[in-house]
């Protein structure tokens, strides 16, 4: 399973990369705005840290506009993946970009049928948002299971990126279901290695070591 980090904070990306956990990066307009820096400057710095897929999102809402923006985005670096919203116009853009050999990540997916449409349009990645579904009392991980089953049934090669990850259980369940990728906030990524018994064990080892004659 691959781990992407879901942030535009270069410090977080660098620190997670040093842990050996980062296979790629997902950004969005909200994350870029939060960084307080220029869009292209942030993306270029990210590509210098992580040698893997870097998702950068279009802003246009019409297919021709999305295609134009996508063609500019991929000029930044060969690892750029264009994030496209799950809309009819987004599907048109995805199909056209796929035909041009431009990788796409169809985002804001909230149903397994939306993921199926994105795969049929030629999406490289599909990004279902599990946390936001959980927020409205729907089963976020349930749609990951449905998408995995459908893609396996019909041989779709689009990779499933589990997005809107809120906790380590989301990551665990994604792995058990067989999702290709989880894109994880830095705060959650740090939680993955934590267990109280690990901390207690280290504390005991250190205490025992103090009793060893020096």
From Swiss-Prot:
Coiled-coil spans in chain? none
Q: Give compartment(s).
A: Cytoplasm
Q: Which UniProt keywords apply?
A: Cytoplasm, Pentose shunt, Schiff base, Transferase
Supply the EC number(s): 2.2.1.2
**Which InterPro entries does the record match to this protein?**
Aldolase_TIM, TAL/FSA, Transaldolase_3B, Transaldolase_3B/F6P_aldolase, Transaldolase_AS, TSA/FSA_arc/bac
Q: Where is the active site?
A: 83
Tell me the PROSITE patterns matching this sequence: TRANSALDOLASE_1, TRANSALDOLASE_2
Q: Which reaction does it catalyse?
A: D-sedoheptulose 7-phosphate + D-glyceraldehyde 3-phosphate = D-erythrose 4-phosphate + beta-D-fructose 6-phosphate
Transferase as UniProt keyword: yes
What are the recorded Gene Ontology BP terms? carbohydrate metabolic process; pentose-phosphate shunt
**Which Gene3D superfamilies is this protein grouped with?**
Aldolase class I
Q: What does the function comment of this entry state? A: Transaldolase is important for the balance of metabolites in the pentose-phosphate pathway.
- Family assignment from sequence similarity: Belongs to the transaldolase family. Type 3B subfamily.
What protein name applies here? Probable transaldolase
């Amino acid at each position: 399973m691959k781990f992407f980090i879901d942030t535009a904070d270069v410090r977080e990306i660098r620190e997670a990369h040093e842990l050996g956990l980062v296979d790629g990066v997902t950004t969005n307009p909200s994350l870029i705005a939060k960084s307080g820096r220029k869009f292209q400057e942030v993306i270029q710095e990210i590509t210098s840290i992580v040698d893997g897929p870097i998702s950068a999102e279009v802003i246009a809402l019409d297919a021709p506009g999305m295609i134009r923006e996508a063609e500019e985005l991929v000029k930044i670096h060969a690892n750029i993946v264009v994030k496209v919203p799950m809309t009819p116009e987004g599907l048109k853009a995805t199909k056209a970009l796929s035909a041009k050999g431009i990788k796409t990540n169809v985002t804001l997916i909230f149903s397994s049928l939306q993921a199926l449409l994105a795969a049929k349009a030629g999406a490289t990645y599909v990004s279902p948002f599990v946390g936001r579904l959980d927020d409205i009392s729907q089963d976020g991980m349930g749609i990951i299971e449905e998408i995995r089953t459908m893609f396996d049934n019909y041989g779709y090669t689009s990779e499933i990126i589990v997005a809107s990850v809120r906790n380590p259980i989301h990551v665990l369940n994604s792995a058990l279901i067989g999702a290709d990728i989880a894109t994880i906030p830095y705060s959650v990524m740090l939680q993955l290695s934590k267990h109280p018994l690990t901390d207690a064990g280290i504390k005991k080892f250190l205490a025992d070591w103090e009793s060893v004659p020096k």
